[in-house]
Every structure is written in structure tokens, then in C-alpha cells.
Amino acid sequence: MLPARTEFQYPGTTMLQQLVPAEMLLVKLLRIWRLARTGRVPEAAWISALRAWDLPDTLDYHFDMLCHAVVTGNRRPLAVCGLGCCQIAEDEGRLLRVMAMLQHHRQAEAATALDAWLFPPAARRAESHMQALALGMSLAELVIPLMPMQLLTRGGWTPTHGQTLIRLAASPLRH
């Protein structure tokens, strides 16, 4: 078992191509969700992207509520890259880090990281929705490593999933 690493951050130079599928899914979903909130893409875009992975429909709700908590409760302006960006932003890395902690049963560390990231009411809301999302993704074998770029068996990765991400990255949603 790895030691506690609540201070861990994804390096600012982390590239999307270095992420495992579960990490890439969350980063792309967050980016598409943010674009939908600004009216630049249809609301259904992020829901379609999530459902392309054959995850339970209830995760739509949990992801949406999680994003609302992160946007409204962030201690600083939200740092999320554009859909076509090849690097991950600070808040994208924070989301991945907390999700990894929850998937690896490190709830206390996840709560500490959320408290440092979000104001307390938003952190509590985000945590409950993240737990549901973490469980749903784990059941679908979409697991985020505790440390980025950790060598994993890429459970859940199929050409269909890869093609979906490629289509998302190359689609008109980038602009």
C-alpha cells in the first residue's frame, strides 16, 4: 500500500496522452460540461460522452452535481483547459486526485483534499457525488491510479472508447 499523499498534485506539464482512460474520460467530461454551461455546445454533449462508456445513467446526475459544486464552491477561479488542449489544468488534476483517493478507499485523504480545494459546504456536496461517481467508474473497471502515469492494466479500455475520445477531441466541440 502506498503512503498517504494528500499533498500530491498532477504536474502542470501532464499531457492528456499520459493519462489512463479513466483519467482522460473525467478530464474531457469536465471540459465538455463547462462548454455546455457557457452555451457553446449542447447540454446533451457531455451526457452523450459519458453514456458512450456504458456507465449507469445515474452517473449523469452525480457528475452534473459534482461539477456544480466545484464551480460554485471553488476557492479560486476554476482552472479547466479548453477541449482541444493537450495538457491538464490545475483543477482537472485536483478532480483526478480526489477521485483516485475515493476509488482506492482513502476517504479521509479525499476529504482533506476537497477541503483545501473547495469551501466547506461545496466540499461536502462534491464528496457525496464523487463517491457515487467513483463507485460507478470502479464497477466499470475505469480506475484512476493513485499516482499519475502509474503502470496499470488498462481495464475497461476498448477501441470503441478510444474512438469516442478521438471523435470528441476532433469534433467541432473543440471551438
Predicted features along the sequence, with ranges:
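Polar/charged low-complexity regulatory segments
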Residues: 1-175
